[in-house]
Amino acid sequence: LGNNGHIGFNEPGAAFEKETHCVDLTESTIQANKRFFEKVEDVPTQAYTMGIKNIMQARKVLLIVSGEGKAEILDKVLYGPVNPQVPASILQLHNDLTVVADEAAMSVIKANHR
């Protein structure tokens, strides 16, 4: 789960009907992945990703979320409206979704949905 609600490299605004495809990475995704490379110029600017349609066709989906920085978006993903601007929100409609989240990632949900 990305800070903006993306899953895979399906960024906000991605069509829910998309299948596996090549995407141009957003600057925020490039910055988030630069820690894996010697310099930011080495980070790929494109990637292949499963489309949201493919993800929703999976028998089971496991969403792992950690850190306080993901708390607000996790609340939107699980309790907000299903919306292409929060791509992972479509997972609310999956028949077999398991979410594994640490205490920090759950903090907003615990505060808002007791």
Which residues fall in each region the model found?
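Conserved phosphate- and dinucleotide-binding cores of soluble alpha/beta proteins
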Residues: 1-114
